[in-house]
Amino acid sequence: MATRGAVAAAASTIWKHRRNPSLRSLSRHFNPNFNHRIIPTGFKYQVRAIQGTSTDPVITPLKNREEPKPQNWKIKMLYDGDCPLCMREVNMLMERNEKHGTIKFVDISSNDYSPEDNQGLDYKTVMGQIHAIQSDGNVVKGVEAFRRLYEEVGLGWVYTITKFEPIGKLADVVYDVWAKYRLQVTGRPSIEAILEARKKDKVETCGESKNCKI
């Protein structure tokens, strides 16, 4: 604003100087200098990254944060924490659940996962497709599990259409295909190889303990 005012004043003076010869004598005294830049107070320059480094803040994945464990949860989500694609959806639900507090998240890939605490659902079974456990002990899976989970965080409308036929059956078929090939699509070993690796890891971690569960 100040720079534009100075330019306007200079232009007005020069114009009058041309029209009125009596002002020519002022030209030797009038020598405006516009080399100084005026920087508005409070203006901050944006710093660019140098040589490919990023200035974006490091965001801790929700998977690595302490998972909320609401006392009055309405549904428990059993998820595969080693699935990078799956974790995008899990992270979104975790964020939404911070407000609602109705979902309890259980990572089946954790060494602490216990089938006994989750209606007897073992690792291999839950790896086959998504499972969720309602507070009354009822187990839901597949598309229905997603629908119940989304409803608890205010996004029930996303899966509302799957309540109606034939859309519901079609959604189940599509999900079943995805669940069947999920490991290959995400570049992971077969379920047999994963189970064998978990078994070895359990042996190394637990030693001679009788309480470890595969």
Swiss-Prot record:
It comes from the Eukaryota. Residues 1-49 form a transit peptide. GO terms for cellular component: chloroplast; mitochondrion. GO terms for molecular function: protein-disulfide reductase activity. GO terms for biological process: tissue regeneration. Pfam families: DCC1-like. Keywords: Chloroplast, Plastid, Transit peptide. It is found in: Plastid, Chloroplast. PANTHER family: OS04G0668800 PROTEIN, SI:CH73-390P7.2. This is Uncharacterized protein At5g50100, chloroplastic.
